[in-house]
Amino acid sequence: MKPGRITHAIALLLSSISSLFAHPAPSKTEPAKAKFNKKSDKLSEGLSLDPISFSPRNFLAPSESGQRYPWKKSIVTTVFWIGEQPSGNNPVPNRASSWDKNWTKNYGGFDDPNPAHRSNYIPVKFTPRQNPFYCALPYSDKATTGHRPEAPRVVPWFKEAYQGPAVSTCKGRWVAIHKGNRTVYAQWEDAGPFRTDHWQYVFGNDRPKPNLNKGAGLDVSPAVRDSLGMNPTDVTDWRFVEFSEVPRGPWSTLGENNTFVINDRKKGAALAEAAKPSGGPIVR
């Protein structure tokens, strides 16, 4: 027998012996396919979200950029002002706000929107006593007494901001407003336009409801208008921001309600207190 044939015979013999001791391989089973409901990743159109079952964490999950509050994109935005009189598309006067019945008085007067009567984002006739960078969103957490029943669940910061039944947890909250290549920061000081109950939009994923102003979902002050270069009716993006995210700018200089002004006064008072003599006995 030739060497090649001997090698081949030995290989066949070894293969036969090993097959006697081999365990049969288990049959390969296909993994079970998960069953998905096509509606599982979105809300059913007929689903009604009641305040008890609603959890804001489902709606205000961090965006791709890691922000706690995602941007509301392409929102019709209109201009309003403190002291505004009723008109065809604005049936409610703005002498008072949802949270301040003496809004015009506390602001210091009529926030004249006429650009010819304004300079450096404020009226030329007086210096406002409140932040001229303000806005309105169509929700108020306050009821006639106390807060709306859904407020503790739908307002993401309700627990940390709660100061008792008479105080709004929404008033004064900072909002970033973006148009083009500009971003302006304003404080939430009123509820509107038109509605005060649309938490599904303000804190959720709904779009603004139809209204007399082309479905507007945000009102901004003349100062915000001028800083962004807005038209009377325009389109912007907006989102809530933590105060720590707000940079200094024209929105940080004025107002007894302004977080920057309040903090600066506290720092000044603390420094003045620290600079006082200790009052102890003088060592000679």
Predicted regions and their residues:
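Bacterial N-terminal signal peptides
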Residues: 9-19
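Secreted/periplasmic proteins
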Residues: 23-284
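Bacterial N-terminal signal peptides that target proteins for export
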Residues: 2-7
